[in-house]
């Protein structure tokens, strides 16, 4: 656990120990490109939990890629769809990778926060620029002309608001992130 000390911040501690003891799920939030889906799959395997990706749930429900949904319905309607899909979903003993824009949905985040430990996978805008090479086809809910740095500045306070644990993933491999999260929730 001490190895991850400089990369992990715990915002809240529950009586009787770390966060996972009283909650059933692990909820991953963060910017597109932070590694939520990759780390989520690895974390679920290591903890013998199920895995869900809310972006995939949205795509399955609407039979379209995220970028197609955003193009057809607009950002505001997409955000409502995302909020509604999360609120209607049932997760138990599950690692949940959310879309980067899930933090705009107050109802969704209240539900997720009440049902799981929320982990913010923090990666700064410079590293995100390196990781995201398909910004227009990826299905990122952002206004035309907005840069990744601007989107980060807009969303970072929301990620911090909802996070129980923050893991700075910029300098860590996915496996190291999994180890850091696992150590903190035990």
For every predicted segment, state its role.
Residues 20-22, 42, 46, 117, ...:
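NTP-dependent small-molecule kinase module
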Residues 28:
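Hydrophobic anchor at the beta1->P-loop junction of P-loop NTPases
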Residues 31:
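P-loop (Walker A) phosphate-binding loop of NTP-binding proteins
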Residues 36:
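Conserved lysine of the Walker
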Residues 39:
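Hydrophobic positions on the alpha1 helix immediately C-terminal to the Walker A/P-loop
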Residues 54-102, 106-111:
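ATP-dependent small-molecule kinase phosphotransfer cores
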Residues 114-157:
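A glycine- and Lys/Arg-enriched "phosphate-lid" helix/loop adjacent to the NTP-binding pocket
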């Amino acid at each position: 656990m001490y190895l991850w000390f400089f990369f992990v911040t715990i915002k809240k501690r529950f009586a009787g120990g770390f966060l996972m003891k009283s909650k059933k799920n692990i909820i991953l939030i963060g910017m597109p490109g932070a590694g939520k889906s990759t780390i989520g799959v690895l974390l679920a395997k290591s903890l013998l939990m199920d895995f869900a990706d809310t972006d995939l749930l949205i795509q399955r429900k609407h039979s379209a890629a995220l970028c197609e949904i955003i193009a057809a319905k607009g950002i505001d309607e997409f955000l409502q769809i995302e909020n509604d899909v999360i609120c209607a979903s049932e997760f138990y003993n599950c690692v949940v990778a959310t879309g980067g824009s899930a933090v705009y949905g107050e109802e969704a985040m209240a539900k997720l926060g009440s049902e799981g430990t929320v982990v913010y996978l923090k990666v700064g805008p410079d590293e995100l620029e390196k990781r995201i090479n398909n910004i227009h086809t990826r299905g990122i809910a952002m206004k035309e002309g907005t840069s990744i740095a601007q989107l980060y500045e807009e969303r970072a306070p929301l990620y911090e608001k909802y996070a129980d644990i923050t893991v700075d993933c910029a300098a860590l491999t996915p496996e190291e992130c999994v180890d850091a999260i696992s150590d903190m929730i035990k």
